[in-house]
From Swiss-Prot:
SUPFAM superfamilies: Ribosomal protein S2 (SSF52313). Transmembrane segments: none annotated. It comes from Flavobacterium psychrophilum (strain ATCC 49511 / DSM 21280 / CIP 103535 / JIP02/86). GO terms for molecular function: structural constituent of ribosome. This is Small ribosomal subunit protein uS2. Belongs to the universal ribosomal protein uS2 family.
Length: 266
C-alpha cells in the first residue's frame, strides 16, 4: 500500500525549492508559497494535494492493465527513473527521446520487434548457432537498440499516459503526447508552464533527492494499482497478438537481424 504523503517528508527532500524568481513562469503563481533569497518556494500543501490527485489517476491506469511511459533524460533523473519505473513494471526512456516515439509508433514497433527477435534467438538457442563474429555483432545491435529505446521492449502499443520529469527538457515528448491526446503527468518546476500537462505536480525537478521522493510516491501508487488490477482481458489479447506476430516469418526476421548487425558500427 502506498505511503501517506507527509508535507514534512517533501520538505526534507527539498521538493519546495524552485528556481530564481527572474526565471519564473507566471502560470506557476498558484503553486508558489513565497520568495526567499531570490528563489521561489513551492507550496508543499498544494504539492501533496496534487500528488494525491495524480496517484488516484495513475492507480486506475495501472489497474486497467495499461502502461505509463516514464520520460527523463536529464542526468540527475535518469538512474532514479529507470530504477523506480522498472520496479513498477513500467516502460521508460532515459536516453535521447526517439523522434516519433509516439506519433510514428509503427516505426518504433519495428525496432522493438528487433529487440524481441534477438531475445528470442538467445532463448531458443539460435543465437549459439551463429559464428563468434556474428554473435558479437548481434550483441552490439541489441545494446544499441536498448540504449535508444530504454525499457520499451514489451510496449506493444501506445502508452495510456506519460510521466515526465522536467517538462522543458522533455518538450518534444509532451508535444507528441498532445497530438495523440495522451495525458501527461509531470513534475513541474517554477520556471515551467503547467498548462502544458494534465496532471501537475509542482516540485523541484532538478535535485535528485526531490526527484527520488516524488518518483517513489507515484510508483508506489502504480504498484498498488497493479495489485488491484481489475481486468486482464485487454492485456492478454495484446500479448496473444504480439506472440502471433513473432512466429510469423521467424527465420526471415533472424536473417534480417544478422544482416543488420553486420552493418552496425562499434
Amino acid at each position: 500500500m502506498a505511503n501517506k504523503i507527509e508535507v514534512k517528508d517533501l520538505l526534507e527532500a527539498g521538493v519546495h525549492f524552485g528556481h530564481m524568481t527572474r526565471k519564473w513562469d507566471p502560470n506557476m503563481a498558484p503553486y508558489i508559497y513565497m520568495e526567499r533569497n531570490g528563489i521561489h518556494i513551492i507550496n508543499l500543501y498544494k504539492t501533496a494535494a496534487k500528488i494525491e490527485e495524480a496517484n488516484e489517476a495513475l492507480k486506475k491506469i495501472a489497474a486497467s492493465g495499461r502502461k505509463i511511459l516514464f520520460v527523463a533524460t536529464k542526468k540527475q533523473a535518469k538512474d532514479i527513473v529507470a530504477e523506480k519505473a522498472a520496479a513498477a513494471n513500467m516502460p521508460y526512456i532515459t536516453e535521447r527521446w526517439p523522434g516519433g516515439m509516439l506519433t510514428n509508433f509503427v516505426t518504433i514497433r519495428k525496432a522493438v520487434k528487433k529487440m524481441s527477435t534477438i531475445d528470442r534467438m538467445k532463448k531458443d538457442g539460435t543465437f549459439m548457432t551463429l559464428s563468434k563474429k556474428e554473435r558479437l555483432q548481434v550483441d552490439r545491435l541489441r545494446a544499441k537498440l536498448e540504449k535508444n529505446l530504454g525499457s520499451i521492449s514489451d510496449m506493444s502499443r501506445l502508452p495510456a499516459a506519460l510521466f515526465v520529469v522536467d517538462i522543458k527538457a522533455e518538450h518534444i515528448a509532451i508535444k507528441e503526447a498532445q497530438k495523440l491526446n495522451i495525458p501527461v503527468f509531470a513534475m513541474v518546476d517554477t520556471n515551467s508552464d503547467p498548462r502544458l500537462v494534465e496532471y501537475v505536480i509542482p516540485a523541484n525537478d532538478d535535485a535528485s533527492k526531490s526527484i527520488d521522493k516524488i518518483l517513489t510516491l507515484v510508483t508506489e501508487a502504480i504498484i498498488d494499482g497493479l495489485a488491484n488490477r481489475t481486468s486482464d482481458k485487454e492485456a492478454d489479447t495484446t500479448t496473444e497478438e504480439v506472440a502471433q506476430e513473432e512466429v510469423t516469418d521467424t527465420k526471415a526476421d533472424e536473417k534480417a537481424i544478422v544482416a543488420e548487425a553486420a552493418k552496425t558500427k562499434e
